[in-house]
Amino acid sequence: MCSSEECLIDKSWTSEEKCEYIKCNQDSCEGGGYLTWSHYVKCQYNIGVRVILIILGILYLIILFVIMSSIADDFFCPAISGIVSHLRMSESIAGVTFLAFGNGAPDVFSSISSVLTTPKPKADLALGDLFGTSIFVTTVVLAIIIFTKSFKVAIIPTLRDLIFYMTTLAFIVFCFLKFDKIEVWMPATFLGIYGVYVVTVIILGIYRTHRKKRNLKKKNKELEDFLSRPSSAASTTPIFGAMKLKEETISVSALFHFMIGYSQFIKNLTRANLKRTTNNNNNDNKNEKRGIVNLGFSEPYSIPSERKISTIFKQNTFETDLESLESLADLDGSDDEGREEKFGYAHHTVFTSHDQISLVASEIEEIEITTWRSWDWVWDLFNHLKSWPSRDEFSEMNIFIKIVTVIKVVPVFFFKLTVPSNEMSWCKPLFILHCFASIQFALFSIQIITLKPFDGSPGLWLYGLGFSAILAMVAMYFLPLSKEQKYYKEIYSYLGFLMSIAWIYATSNEIVSVVTMIGVVTGLSMELLGLTIMAWSNCIGDIVADIAVVKQGYPKMAMAAAIGGPLFNLLIGFGLPFTIAAAQGKEMELLINPVYRLLMLFLGISLVTTFVALFIQRFTVRRPHAVLLIFIFVVFLIFICLAEFHVLEWN
């Protein structure tokens, strides 16, 4: 009965026998978290209490998904953005490495947790989650994006991602058909495919940059020729008729963006406007999110046609160098990949990079602290640890966001207590708390807090406490109370990255534990639970973010995330944990059961459908394409249910 590779409970067993089986096979019947839900439920012989435990487990699962979403969006992604900024990585490299890792963190860590936390890896749960997420995103999420707005796709990036995706799927099918267990070279090949993908992105990015610079040099010369015309001609030429270069008019919106971005005068006005918006939110911007100022002006500005170009040039000084023109071309949107704007994702709302700065600035009130004797430092610490919105902000939320916000109050408090954030201002008391809380939670998250390095030794928690005390004393003596340190943001980016991983990893273990309990109680397979509960819950944030991105005018970015995101999750989520597990000597079977056949079949159908539809529609996605994707997903669900209940047998 013990050492079973799968948690298979016979319905004819008594309750005591089922409980003993769970205790004897915790590696296969539990998920690796601190709470052993299968044991709690199956070893409870009172039916009423058992039902209550199951309900509590489901509620706990919902809270865990909220925690996962919050830590990934509000702490992990900003930390990654800070690291990318510090390393000065190009957008193409950052987009397929750090930023993709940030977006796919829940899926990747769920896979790592289900594979590495037990001696007998749950490969079926990991693959079910990855495949289920892939199908859901490439059908439902992509369809929602298209329903929101029809648009012309970025041709080269979209085709690149689809080709790599279909190649990866073909390799998975090959492995399932030819082998019955996972060898170390199989997941390593996935990591190799990801390496080739990154190199391809870099090469295409270099080519695109070279092409853009060549075109911009040409436009630079033409613009200089235009500006060198006699001032009398320029002063009487309306802006809508004068800026014609090679029969291609530069939009007024792009020109206005250009002058705003490179005029110190306008920058100063923007800072003043930002300050006014933060402090006087209850006036004209009462219905907008407090502290948010869109410095990019997503809507085109209209300038009266009678305004003369010479007047504008006199009011705003700027240089017409190559770098400035590069920004002008990006804003004009003529590039195949569309406008390139760095995005932050916080509180289920997508903001541009400068918007997010405003958001953070509005959340924490600045307090000047001069001495420990005053109690200002207590109020400053309270503001930094505050995890609930103001009354005005809460009243403006809809009912769903209010519920999520209430759920997040306690978790966010512990996030702020243990995760250094590069978005918050310097707070020395909070740094000292981080010295203790962060180290203890890091040990707790990987379940070694009570581990004894040798016989007679105290647990690692005591060693961590001693190390924390040393750090705290150094901070007390050397760090100033109010002045922000030079590399504070950079250091907090890396520390926040590590602590966010600790939270995501611990949360993933608990999620797997609850999902495993549901499988034990209902008798449903791990594949079905992975491709439904785990996959769909991880996609809720994607839907919210992608719709927001589309509504802000960036549908190409949303579509790139809908295709490139699951590709990254599949390559890294399968390649990394299974490579480590195989290197450790763990045996993992490759069972091509009907569920896996359907997963691979319908994922291939969805990818091929999108690939062919792009050519048929001449790379402009429309609603019939979205309807077809929804139909594919509905048919997939029907077949999965038939296969799960053995109505459909695929031999």
Curated annotation (Swiss-Prot):
Description of activity control: Inhibited by the sodium/calcium exchanger inhibitor CGP-37157.
PANTHER family membership: MITOCHONDRIAL SODIUM_CALCIUM EXCHANGER PROTEIN-RELATED (PTHR12266:SF30), NA+/CA2+ K+ INDEPENDENT EXCHANGER (PTHR12266)
Protein name: Mitochondrial sodium/calcium exchanger protein
Database matches in InterPro entries: CaCA_antiporter, NaCa_Exmemb, NCX_ion-bd_dom_sf
GO cellular component term, pick one: mitochondrion
GO biological process, one term: monoatomic cation transport
Family matches, as Pfam families: Na_Ca_ex (PF01699)
Stretches that traverse the bilayer: 51-71, 92-112, 127-147, 162-182, 184-204, 399-419, 429-449, 459-479, 487-507, 511-531, 560-580, 596-616, 627-647
Record's bilayer topology term: Multi-pass membrane protein
Entry comment describing in which tissues the protein is expressed: Expressed in the seam cells of the organism. Expression is visible in the seam cells across all larval stages, and expression persists into the adult stage of the organism.
Naturally occurring in which organism (per UniProt): Caenorhabditis elegans
GO molecular function: calcium:sodium antiporter activity
